[in-house]
Structures are given as structure tokens and as C-alpha cells.
Regions:
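Flexible, glycine-rich active-site loops centered on histidine and acidic residues
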Residues: 72-104
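Short acidic, glycine/serine/threonine-rich loops at helix termini
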Residues: 29-31, 89-93, 265-269
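Conserved active-site "lid/cap" helical segment
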Residues: 1-16, 142-196, 207-215, 240, ...
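Claisen-condensing/thiolase-fold acyl-transfer catalytic domains that form or cleave C-C bonds
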Residues: 24-25, 38, 43-45, 51-73, ...
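Condensing-enzyme catalytic core mediating Claisen C-C bond formation in acyl metabolism
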Residues: 93-171, 175, 179, 259, ...
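Short beta-strand segments
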Residues: 21, 52, 77-83, 109, ...
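Acidic-glycine-rich active-site phosphate/pyrophosphate-binding loop
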Residues: 27-42, 79-85, 148-154, 207-219
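Buried hydrophobic positions in well-ordered alpha/beta secondary-structure cores of metabolic enzymes
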Residues: 3, 15-18, 36, 61, ...
Length: 272
């Protein structure tokens, strides 16, 4: 609703597809995108789907939306992200509760806008699935196990709450993010100095600083938006883009890269 309120050139009746990225839907069924269509008062002759991805979700959403537009299935795609990881965190999980924040975003992807969507570099490695997981609640292990215990540091361990192997996630990140950035540059026929701004998934400040130094990116070209919201999963990149746009920093080539749970990663260049 805020998107339509602040953008007079975007009308509800122009939306012909809804993409909704979330890993914390209200229901197993129906599809949340169908509920959103009704709640927003959108037309009924439109497409609407959910997809479940975490920190790479926004960039994947851009890829899906671009495909829908190029394939002439849609002209104006409403791309939504919404994540409430707080539902998955035990109240005494001090480590993860200080990292994650709940947030949502709304973007219109169309043939007109402030930036052209370039080529994508995508990646998947399911071997890392167990390193960031909520085991119960879905069809494989539907019932809660109530197997709560505490490790030597007093952190809760339970199949019913989010588990993150921080060391393995860091290893995955420092190995794969430079690769996806390099692949994204290659796909778009660009060199690193030609990128005006790098907007990566806002995992945490330490990890982002490590990656920036590893990839030898100047600090003034590397965007941070964490202090007020934390790691907002699929919403972190669009929130950062929104803030960067307010600061008039979305000029020239802007490289986006999302990475995390799955493992899943994705990169693209926006040409503003």
C-alpha cells in the first residue's frame, strides 16, 4: 500500500503479476500471494506465486520478474519480500537474535524505471542445507520435537528453532561471494572499477567488511545498511537500495549479490 501511495505513476490496476518471497508464510496453503492479491485489491486476471528463498531471494525475484517480462507474460511485476525470522528464534538465543531483524519490501519491476536489469549469475549447493535450518514444521518433520537443550555457552539447541553453524556459513560466504561477484561482472562484460556501488546482502558488518577487503573494493563504493534493521534476509538488498536511492547513490552500474541459506547465491548488475 505504501508503494502505491508514494508513487502516483504506479497504479494497482497496472499490476499483472505478484511474486512473493518468504520463508515464513502465514499458511502452508493457500499461497500467500493469492491472499495479497485480495488484500491489495488487485485485479483477478493476474498471476501470483510464492517462492521460498532466503538471503538470495530478492535477486532471484528480479531474475524471475525479468523473465516474465521478456517472455511477455507480464508487463508490471509486483515483487514482494517479507521475512519474520523472529518466529524461528528461541527467546534465549542471544547470538541469532542480535543478528536478524523482521522486514518487508515492495518493488515494481516493469519496462520503465530508474535502472535496467542486466545479466544474472546464479548458484546453488544443497550440501550446505544443514548449516542453516529449521528442521520441524514442514511435511518431513511436521510435529515439534520439544528437544530443547543448551550448549556449553548457554545457547539453546532445538529442532524447533533456527540452527545456524556460523563457522560453516562464514566459510561458504568467503569462498562463494567473490566468485559470484566475478561471475556477475563477466556476465555483464564489466570490470570491477566500472561498478559505482556494490550492494550485497546485509549479513553482518564483520562479514561485509571481510568480503570488501578480500575483493579489494573501495569503502566508498560498498554500501552498508545494518545498524537500524540488522540482517533482514530477502529484504536486506531492497531495503539497502531504497536507502541508497534516498542518498542519491544509485548512479551508473550497481552490483547486487545475495547469498545464504540453501546454500543459494545470485548476482546481477543494475544499470541506472
Amino acid at each position: 500500500n505504501n508503494l502505491f501511495a508514494i508513487n502516483s505513476d504506479i497504479k494497482r490496476e497496472d499490476v499483472d503479476f505478484v511474486l512473493f518471497c518468504t520463508q515464513s508464510p502465514d499458511y502452508f496453503l493457500p499461497t500467500s500471494a493469492c491472499l495479497i492479491q485480495e488484500q491489495l485489491g488487485l485485479r483477478t486476471n493476474i498471476g501470483a506465486i510464492d517462492y521460498s528463498l532466503g538471503c538470495s531471494g530478492y535477486v532471484y525475484g528480479l531474475a524471475i520478474a525479468k523473465g516474465l517480462i521478456i517472455g511477455r507474460i507480464a508487463k508490471n511485476v509486483l515483487l514482494l519480500t517479507a521475512e519474520t525470522y523472529s518466529k524461528f528464534l528461541h527467546p534465549r538465543d542471544k547470538g541469532n537474535r542480535t543478528i536478524f531483524g523482521d522486514a518487508a519490501s515492495a518493488s515494481i519491476i516493469s519496462t520503465e524505471g530508474f535502472a535496467e536489469i542486466g545479466e544474472f549469475a546464479l548458484g546453488t549447493d544443497g550440501k550446505g542445507a544443514n548449516n542453516l535450518i529449521v528442521r520441524t514444521g514442514a511435511s518431513r518433520e511436521k510435529k515439534t520435537k520439544n528437544d530443547l537443550s543448551f550448549d556449553e555457552n548457554g545457547n539453546p539447541v532445538s529442532s524447533d528453532y533456527l540452527y545456524m553453524n556460523g563457522a560453516e556459513i562464514f566459510t561458504f560466504t568467503q569462498k562463494n561471494v567473490p566468485v559470484v561477484v566475478k561471475d556477475t561482472l563477466l556476465k555483464n562484460n564489466l570490470e570491477q572499477p566500472e561498478i559505482n556501488l556494490f550492494v550485497l546482502h546485509q549479513a553482518n558488518k564483520y562479514m561485509l567488511n571481510f568480503l570488501r577487503k578480500k575483493m579489494k573494493i573501495e569503502e566508498e563504493k560498498f554500501y552498508y545498511f545494518l545498524s537500524e534493521v540488522g540482517n533482514t534476509v530477502s529484504s536486506s538488498i531492497p531495503l539497502a537500495l531504497c536507502e541508497a536511492k534516498r542518498e542519491n547513490r544509485l548512479n551508473g552500474n550497481v552490483l547486487l549479490a545475495g547469498f545464504g541459506v540453501g546454500y543459494s547465491w545470485a548476482g546481477v548488475v543494475l544499470k541506472a
